[in-house]
């Protein structure tokens, strides 16, 4: 299944931690149980502390469900989704 790098950034002013209900909703949203409803497997999710920056590695059949899964984050900032490959995949294919 293809891998996707999903990146979300927001400002200190729009940070979801300022809105407990938004924080709870997004916290529940970024669960494997919920991601499975979109046909997505979460490989990794990390936040850069104090930088208002979330990054996720997700597996999905196509980019469309990833875009839909990341939609709620666009309420408070930007979202970018890019198809990626593992180093092993690049080595095996001989192409970057």
Map each language-model feature to its residues.
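Short S/T/G/P-rich N-terminal loop/turn motif that feeds into the first structured element of a domain
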Residues: 1-36, 41-52, 61-64, 87-96
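A common structural junction motif
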Residues: 73-81
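Short acidic-hydrophobic, aromatic-tinged amphipathic segments that line or gate anion-handling sites
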Residues: 82, 86
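Short amphipathic alpha-helices in soluble, non-transmembrane regions
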Residues: 66-74
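Conserved RNP beta-strands of RNA recognition motif
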Residues: 56-57
């Amino acid at each position: 299944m293809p891998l996707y790098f999903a990146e979300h950034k927001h400002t200190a002013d729009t940070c979801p931690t300022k809105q407990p209900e938004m924080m709870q909703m997004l916290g529940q949203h970024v669960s494997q149980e919920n991601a499975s409803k979109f046909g997505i497997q979460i490989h990794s999710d990390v936040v850069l502390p104090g930088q208002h920056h979330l990054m996720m590695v997700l597996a999905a059949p196509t980019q469309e469900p990833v875009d839909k899964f990341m939609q709620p984050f666009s309420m408070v900032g930007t979202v970018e989704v890019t198809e990626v490959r593992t180093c092993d995949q690049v080595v095996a294919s001989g192409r970057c």
